[in-house]
Amino acid sequence: MTLEQTLAIIKPDAVERNLIGNIISRLEDKGFQIIAMKMLHLNQEQAEGFYAEHRNKAFFTELVKYMTSAPIVVLVLQKENAVKDYRTFMGTTNPEIAENGTLRYEFAINQTQNSVHGSDSLENAQREIAYFFAEAEIYAR
């Protein structure tokens, strides 16, 4: 059994609607172990750095504005096939076509305010986890 780690973010719209506990409960119900977690309010520089790969895309400015609009909760999740399983559980970016039972189907407002983020590959998970957490802050079981 090979455990993977992935980064999850509970985004500003979900934090503002008091959905943190609900989302965390659903993650644990799906077998994810939370091995690191913190709440923070990104500034513009932090948001631009995290989403640097999208800098030249049309939605970049709106994304940065949204991600700095209120606090977020960042988590490191661990389980077998964590990246793929969390991507599936999140649902598609557009909540109008997200599958019933996914986090975005349940909680997302629109494509920008889609409540959660998840790493899209193991390599990106490692980079994204390191962006928010020092090794000493992660309690792998």
Swiss-Prot record:
It is an enzyme of class 2 (transferase). SUPFAM superfamilies: Nucleoside diphosphate kinase, NDK. It catalyses: a 2'-deoxyribonucleoside 5'-diphosphate + ATP = a 2'-deoxyribonucleoside 5'-triphosphate + ADP; a ribonucleoside 5'-diphosphate + ATP = a ribonucleoside 5'-triphosphate + ADP. It is found in: Cytoplasm. Keywords: ATP-binding, Cytoplasm, Kinase, Magnesium, Metal-binding, Nucleotide metabolism, Nucleotide-binding, Phosphoprotein, Transferase. Its EC number is 2.7.4.6. Its cofactor is Mg(2+). ATP binds at K11, F59, R87, T93, R104, N114. GO terms for biological process: CTP biosynthetic process; GTP biosynthetic process; UTP biosynthetic process. It comes from the Bacteria. It holds the Pfam family NDK. InterPro entries: NDK-like_dom, NDK-like_dom_sf, Nucleoside_diP_kinase, Nucleoside_diP_kinase_AS. One of its GO terms (molecular function) is ATP binding. Its main location: cytoplasm. Belongs to the NDK family. Major role in the synthesis of nucleoside triphosphates other than ATP. The ATP gamma phosphate is transferred to the NDP beta phosphate via a ping-pong mechanism, using a phosphorylated active-site intermediate. Homotetramer. NCBIfam families: PRK00668.1 (NF001908). This is Nucleoside diphosphate kinase. The lineage of its organism: Bacteria, Pseudomonadati, Pseudomonadota, Gammaproteobacteria, Pasteurellales. The gene is ndk.
